[in-house]
Amino acid sequence: MKFFALAALFASTVNSIAVDGLIPGARVIPANDVVALKKAGAYHQKHHHRRTVIIRSSSSDEDDVSADFLWGIKRANHGGRLLLQNGKKYVIGKKLDLTFLKDIEVQLDGELKFTNDVPYWQANNFYYDFQKSISFWRWGGEDIKIFGSGVLNGNGQRWYNEFAGQEILDPNNKYYRPILFVTENATRVSVEGITQLNSPCWTNFFVRTKDISFDNVFIHAYSTNASALPKNTDGFDTLNVDGLTVTNTRVDIGDDCLSPKPNTTNVFVKNLWCNGTHGASMGSIGQYPGVLDIIENVWIENVTLLNGENGARLKAWAGPDVGYGRINNVTYKNIHVENTDNPIVLDQCYFNINATQCAAYPSRVNFTNIVFEDIYGTSSGKRGKVVADLTCSPNAVCSGIRLKNIHLTSPAGSPPVIVCDGIQGDIGVECQSSSNSTTKRSVDLARSLKYRA
């Protein structure tokens, strides 16, 4: 009898410890309670069992669970997992600083949705000087895993409507829009399986981050208003990043599919699908006066680019008050383009600068050791017969530029035209100067229409 009494007392003590400090609607499942983990939806074949934290979900789009989410993150930190359950919605209406993380998993099977309270978010956010960027939240620390079958929803329609007709790089722009997912001072971050939907601005922005990977992610931005389409909803943007991997991912947005920015090194991309985008881009870099920018050691393979402005693109700023730097050791291999305005383009007259200004104040960003190999498909014909425009600045070095096995055609006619100006050495294929009278008309058309945003 004493044994059973002691056992009952022990069980009572354990239960009291387990619920101590819980907030309403929350619970914690021990890692060894496999039955409870399975019942809650926290059992995952690819991930080991962990102490799992569950928080209450939102009862409506007005039910902000930001405080619950932050509590859940803190409770799951240091070896646990926060589970956002399938079929449930979690509304975030307050900015969140999540830069204290260490060894945490977030299993997103439900929907994590931000409010569209524009006045609140424009007054309460995390601000970055680079291109006047803001975010709802920021994730930092080390060993952070986000996975699942759920949705991270930026709720961007109101932002699209109110930003219509404006430009992100307009120096007078004051309508700042949040980025959907931001890492800052983070190491070893992985995101797998989720959908990222309708970001108000860039979808992902990684700042001072090392070793971040995305696998099997779907990024999508669409508008229900034909006169207010999503703008600047880039798939991936970086700043001071070493080690970015993107694999088996689909991107259906209205801007760059991929766009590493200043001081990004060691990028690996494989099996990427992009629709309606501005290309798998390097840059832009060289924007800020006197600042050295670098992009280096990039491998991009097995990419499909459909119905877009650009395919494989490198872009650098020109003008009287810009920076300098280099894009070096970049390989594009096995790239399939269809109905794409500029299948291959080196753009050293970025952003919003005409040919006369660019000639007067050329770029100081070097493009070196750039390989385009096994590039095939069709242009849109919007740039005439030009399928590749490789034009370098007289102030910069363009060397080691190589094209191999290029099989691109244009519906505007044959033969397709590859333009090369200012490049040092043989590029490996026949190309023509833009001053050639037989190509000048197509080139002028291409450059007059070339996208500048």
Curated annotation (Swiss-Prot):
It is an enzyme of class 3 (hydrolase). Keywords: Cell wall biogenesis/degradation, Disulfide bond, Glycoprotein, Glycosidase, Hydrolase, Repeat, Secreted, Signal. It is found in: Secreted. Glycans are attached at N185, N225, N263, N275, N302, N329, N354, N366, N436. One of its GO terms (biological process) is pectin catabolic process. The active site is at D255 (proton donor), H278. Residues 1-16 form the signal peptide. PbH1 repeats lie at residues 295-316, 327-348, 362-405. Gene3D superfamilies: Single-stranded right-handed beta-helix, Pectin lyase-like. GO terms for molecular function: galacturan 1,4-alpha-galacturonidase activity; polygalacturonase activity. One of its GO terms (cellular component) is extracellular region. It catalyses: [(1->4)-alpha-D-galacturonosyl](n) + H2O = alpha-D-galacturonate + [(1->4)-alpha-D-galacturonosyl](n-1). Disulfide bonds join C257-C274, C392-C398. Specific in hydrolyzing the terminal glycosidic bond of polygalacturonic acid and oligogalacturonates. Belongs to the glycosyl hydrolase 28 family. This is Probable exopolygalacturonase B. It comes from Aspergillus fumigatus (strain CBS 144.89 / FGSC A1163 / CEA10). The lineage of its organism: Eukaryota, Fungi, Dikarya, Ascomycota, Pezizomycotina. The gene is pgxB.
